[in-house]
């Protein structure tokens, strides 16, 4: 399965050692010629493809974890990225302040470079699609219809989520309708008698 070329051993252990040695001697490979994310971190072009979004400068943990992540991944090729992240977080917490200091200094240097390159930069996190949908849903349910009458069920603006099925009437929680009660109601009839029952505590 393994072959010898020019008398060199190409076993997995030797290959892994060669990769690590290559990475140490060619560290610019990992930074200047890396991905767009790496180019941003080293002061290169920080704009994402097709967007005018500037990435944040790296913090001390990210500076430290970049090289550590590569080492852990090479030592444990079967390890999932989420497991590597957990391990790196634990290892970072175990470092002393003196061991972390060079990474804080490098992060400070990168922050200063970023500030010089983008003087008007302000961090604006992108909202995920799910969050945007939830916000739109809250806005929809928090608006009062102009034809709503006193005593009608009026959705209120909410912070977070309510238990499914509970609603409010005049600011008071009311008992959710059962399937049988719901069938008895028609769109033309009011539900004031059902809705005026206080919610169980």
From Swiss-Prot:
Residue spans binding DNA: 54-122
SMART domains associated with the record: HMG
Record's compositionally biased regions (Polar residues): 186-195
Subcellular locations according to the entry: Nucleus speckle; Cytoplasm; Nucleus
Pfam families: HMG_box
InterPro entries: HMG_box_dom (IPR009071), HMG_box_dom_sf (IPR036910), SRY (IPR017253), SRY-related_HMG-box_TF-like (IPR050140)
Biological process terms in GO annotation: cell differentiation; male sex determination; sex differentiation
Gene Ontology CC terms, in alphabetical order: cytoplasm; nuclear speck; nucleus
Keywords, alphabetical: Activator, Calmodulin-binding, Cytoplasm, Differentiation, DNA-binding, Nucleus, Sexual differentiation, Transcription, Transcription regulation
A GO term, aspect molecular function: RNA polymerase II cis-regulatory region sequence-specific DNA binding
Main location per the UniProt record: nucleus
Region (Disordered): 162-201
The keyword Nucleus appears for this protein: yes
Database matches in PANTHER family: SEX-DETERMINING REGION Y PROTEIN, SOX TRANSCRIPTION FACTOR
Assembly description: Interacts with CALM, EP300, HDAC3, KPNB1, ZNF208 isoform KRAB-O, PARP1, SLC9A3R2 and WT1. The interaction with EP300 modulates its DNA-binding activity. The interaction with KPNB1 is sensitive to dissociation by Ran in the GTP-bound form. Interaction with PARP1 impaired its DNA-binding activity.
General function of this protein: Transcriptional regulator that controls a genetic switch in male development. It is necessary and sufficient for initiating male sex determination by directing the development of supporting cell precursors (pre-Sertoli cells) as Sertoli rather than granulosa cells. Involved in different aspects of gene regulation including promoter activation or repression. Binds to the DNA consensus sequence 5'-[AT]AACAA[AT]-3'. SRY HMG box recognizes DNA by partial intercalation in the minor groove and promotes DNA bending. Also involved in pre-mRNA splicing.
UniProt record similarity statement: Belongs to the SRY family.
Protein name as catalogued: Sex-determining region Y protein
Gene designation: SRY
């Amino acid at each position: 399965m393994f072959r010898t070329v020019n008398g060199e051993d190409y076993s997995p252990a030797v290959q892994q050692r060669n990769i690590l040695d290559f990475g140490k001697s060619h560290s610019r490979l990992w930074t200047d010629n890396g991905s767009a994310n790496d180019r941003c971190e080293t002061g290169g072009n920080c704009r994402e493809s097709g967007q005018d979004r500037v990435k944040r400068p790296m913090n001390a943990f990210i500076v430290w974890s970049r090289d550590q992540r590569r080492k852990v991944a090479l030592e444990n090729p079967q390890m999932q990225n989420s497991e590597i992240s957990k391990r790196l977080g634990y290892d970072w917490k175990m470092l002393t302040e003196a061991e972390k200091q060079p990474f804080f200094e490098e992060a400070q240097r990168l922050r200063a470079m970023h500030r010089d390159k983008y003087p008007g930069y302000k961090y604006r996190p992108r909202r995920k699609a799910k969050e945007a949908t939830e916000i739109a849903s809250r806005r929809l349910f928090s608006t009062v219809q102009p034809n709503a009458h006193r005593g009608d069920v009026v959705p209120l603006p909410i912070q977070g989520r309510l238990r499914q099925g509970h609603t409010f009437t005049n600011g008071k929680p009311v008992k959710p309708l059962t399937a049988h009660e719901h069938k008895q109601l028609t769109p033309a009839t009011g539900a004031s008698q059902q809705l005026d029952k206080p919610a169980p505590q």
